[in-house]
Amino acid sequence: MAKYNNNNYANKATNLKQQVVLPTYTLDSNLVLLPGIMYNVTFSRFKAAALLYRYKNFISQVSIINNLLSEYDFNSGNSNEEERSETEQKIEQSSLGQPETYHEINPSVISTEAVEGIKEFFQYETNMKTGRGGKGEKEAKSTNDGIKEFDWLTLAIIPNLDKIKDPETNYSIGDAAKLTNVVTVARIIGIVDDSTNIKLTLQAITRGVQITDDSKMNQHKNGLKTNEQVIGIDWNHNVSDLKGKFNALQKNYQQLFQSIDKFLIDYREALDYNKNNSNNKNGNLSLIKGNATINNNKNSDDKSNQDIKSQNLLTLNPLANALYMQLVGSKDFNKAFHRLEKLFSQVSKNDEYKIDNETYLRLVDLTCGILPFPNFQKLALLNKYKLDDRSVLINEMILQLIQIFENLQTNNSFVNNWFHSEATNIQKANVVANQLKSIRNLLEGMTKNRPIKSNKRNPGPASSSGPSFSNGKSSPGRANARPKSNHQDGFNGNDGDYNDVDDDDDGDEDLKAIFNFIKHKLPTISTLSADSKRLILKDFKRVKASANSPGGGGNSDFHVLRNYLEIVMDIPWDNYVTKFKSNKDIDLKLAKKQLDDDHYGLEHVKKRLIQYLVVLKLLGINAEKDQSDKSQPIKDNSKDSPNSSSKALTKSPTSSLSRKTISSIVIANKDETYLAKQQAKTTNQKSITEAKTNPSTTMITSNESIHVSKNNKSPIIMLAGPPGTGKTSLAKSIASALGRNFQRISLGGIKDESEIRGHRRTYVGAMPGLLIQALRKSRCMNPVILLDEIDKVIGGNNSGGVNKFNGDPSAALLEVLDPEQNNTFIDHYLGFPIDLSQVIFICTANDPWNMTRPLLDRLETIEIGAYDYNEKLIIGKKYLLPRQIKRNGFPVVDTKKMTTVVAGSSNQDEFIRINDATMKKVILDYTRGEAGVRNFERRLGTLCRFKAVEYCEWLNKDIKNYNPIIDENDLPIYLGVPYSSGDVTTEGTVGVGVVHGLSYNSDGSGSVLVFESIGFDRRISNKEHNGGNGATLNMTGRLGEVLMESGKIGLVFIKSMIYKNILKFDNNNNNKHLLLDKYNNLDIHMHVPMGSVSKDGPSAGVTMALSFLSVLLDKPVPSDIAMTGEITLRGIILPIGGVKEKLMGAHLNSNIKRMIVPRENRKDLIKEYSRSIEEAGEVLDHHLINDLIKDNEDKEFKLTQVEEYYQNKYGISLFYAKEFYDIIKIVWNEDEVLLKQDNSRLLEYHI
């Protein structure tokens, strides 16, 4: 026998009662929560967010809750009411326990009294578990360290009496006087997000009583909110005569279990016989016990009696069917029932098992919660606040259920005996006919009357998540990977006959979700044409016709069409997400601040995005004015329509449930979205009638909300620049500033058109393209989609001989990135147009010239150049170093989460401090030649890791002091030997034929290249040689074809200058013949150092021409001059690209003091000058820019602010040349190289 531990709580009675303030919540379903059991309850996303928002100050670390709360804006007062439908407003009112006249729709955080009440409740609960008994309030308030995030989610669940009916009167219990004010104190311990609904796991802890007339109620009267109550809780579990009550409960339960076991055996035997009999050769139901001839043999009589026993009519009894479905309809329920029986048997057989008061009371509640008792009896047991009354009631309920099984067995025996022994064949046939007729009438009533009586039905379980045993712990399950449909009001009668689609309750959940989408959601989609909806409806009817047959009834397209409809259903139709409530409420300052906080500089990119937001704001203001001019009925209806750019349009979801079983006592899932679904169906039926009478006004409200955004085409931007300049992170920042969802699509290496447009459904395993998949992942139709590395798509200019069997993906992007076409983008898998006009496409590219011309023409290109070391210094101090300090584990205070931020409040200087000189040395010596900041951030990360090691050693007291300062002398210790200087090839004295050129590297940086030329006179080696065949040119250094052509052009131009007798040579009058003879006998070898690096491009034409001229005239070129520019056969200097990068490359070389650039590139320098002023935060004088542009049109400009700016910033003097004669004068300005002064058409331009 079991032992009994009757604890004596008499000395602690005063400490076992408490009165605390707790948040309250009223369920929409008829679910009754009994203590000791965990329940899975499905909520709509809005209702779950409204409930969890009340605890937002205590659950900030739970990511799934933060993601849910971010979908709704509860902080904007009552203005949020416009975002929600009337259905959801009524749902919120009912859940708060308020009448429909209650206007404070937005939820509010729990009050201070409720916070203290949760603390006190948690402390009492903890003490009861540890056996310490209750504590006083003061002591309870002082011990809050053990409260975790989910422990705060404590509330009092009020049963919905209006949903629980009394079987005697058939009226809801709420219509009569309420029995008591008993509530269930529960805690949310699990959250599952299936992308459509939210499933909360509620752990019922104990009973409580609402205190209405009490001193504590009056004490908190002013501080309490409407959804909070003072709850009285009695932790006293002392049961009188524990042994006698447990023996009575155990005896009654064993008797009940035997009755249930016998019933299940009889039912299964009858069920198995009928199943086997249906497979006989005749295939007909036998209404007589044998053939017409009766065999008097005893064996025949025994067989006949056995057939009578087997042909049990139990399966035709409605009560038997109802009990059987409750007992074995769910695997989880069946599992919990048998484990409960095992627990009773274990207690009775184990002598060492102690039965205390808490275990007994828990068994009482478990017995009531698991056994098939109706909800009104469960409510009655919940209301039994006194322990003795509870014990009496549970025994009465068990005895009543035993009597039901006994009566069922007696009645079934009577019917079987009459049917098989006394009834004639005609009577048997009439019985079966009446049964079939009753079933038919019931089915017809369920089909016809459901829309009318839908709001009066009691909600059943959405699906069985079943009861199982509890170990006192539970963890949130995983979300269902298959999202369900969304119900929205409204109907377009011209899109198809949706009323012909019948609901099939016998189908699986996935087909029900598809049906709900076709029935309720599809007619309301404004971005789909009538033809597209007709095609979808046609495919659905094909699936519906094969759904009731196993495996699709032999239809090979069944699973293909079903997957297709599930994907169509999963697309977020008409769902537009943004940070701002409406377009007219866009906060431009907030968006600009977001961009500035994430990235330094890049003002030209930020300016373009702010312009886009300004256009949206103006369109929103204009739309509001246009809306006010419309008729009053339309104006009133438009107030209830959600705006397309509002925060995550509210949904009216269907029920769904994860099939994952939680290892605990869990009651079958109750669907809290039932009220929303029923009201949505009623509203939908009403809208159908209105659509038939006046179809033109049906969709005005929803179309009006989307019309604001559709007037403005979303920009299609391409960020072009070298790697590491922040293109991808800038796209994320754009999405954050706009409050839109972000999706990234990597296009690098894509060579199949189907990756963009999707595969056709005829292929096995076909799926939509990357764009449709991005819409599904973002859950909205207006995300920010980043098309990363668009210049590396295999196709167009990148085809390189690749066969076009798989199509050209770069050509497929032409439709996507064209604002005039992407509103009707057709994916091969879907087969109908999709509106992508609200998607902001941001492309990134390193080499835009690799793209095809039509594709490049569709993009608004924004150049992002390389950073100079001053910009890198600011970026490193403001962004990179704080990020690396935090990533490497230093306990840095996050100022963004502080309510009040004081200047200098960040404590990162306590861990690592790097001055500007050290930071600059890292940039110049350890990340030389980098256009972006990736290597720079890696170096900073290395420094932080070394310091992290020292910090840990200091914490472990291995070293005495920790020095956070890093100076220049520490860099070789942490980073090693710096890179070799790039000035090696440029060092040395002035030499003949040695000229410094400038290059733009593939990584986006600039550098100085040295062109070395040496000339050999063939006449010296061969004195008998009388004439020359012309100069020969040999070029080495891994040079490209374009660069070698530029060298040949420069050499020919030098020859033309000799023929024109322009150059001087040895102050001799016979200059032309002497120079020509030397030229014809000259062998020139030109080499460009760093031979492993390929070099190409026309910008070194002037450099090579000057090198050849230096060799011919034997005149050295100053080593402090670098030049760039393309040369023609006429000696004209053409503009080149990458002037800013080449200027920074010259600046990094300490030998370069002067720089020659083409005259036409001065406009690029003016542009960079104005951009640099803006990014530095200074006010740009627009009048000065206009004056500079006008002055630049003159041959001899007078305004030198641009040149002075670069002189001060980089220490380099700028010179401009339009013809090669200008370069000769700039280089050899003190010598008279030119024979005729009037041949110089232009003067040099310098400071």
UniProtKB/Swiss-Prot annotation:
It is an enzyme of class 3 (hydrolase). Residues 459-477 have a biased composition (Low complexity). One of its GO terms (molecular function) is ATP hydrolysis activity. Its EC number is 3.4.21.53. It is found in: Peroxisome matrix. Residues 989-1230 form the Lon proteolytic domain. GO terms for biological process: protein import into peroxisome matrix; protein processing; protein quality control for misfolded or incompletely synthesized proteins. It comes from the Eukaryota. Residues 22-402 form the Lon N-terminal domain. Residues 626-639 have a biased composition (Basic and acidic residues). It catalyses: Hydrolysis of proteins in presence of ATP. ATP-dependent serine protease that mediates the selective degradation of misfolded and unassembled polypeptides in the peroxisomal matrix. Necessary for type 2 peroxisome targeting signal (PTS2)-containing protein processing and facilitates peroxisome matrix protein import. This is Lon protease homolog 2, peroxisomal.
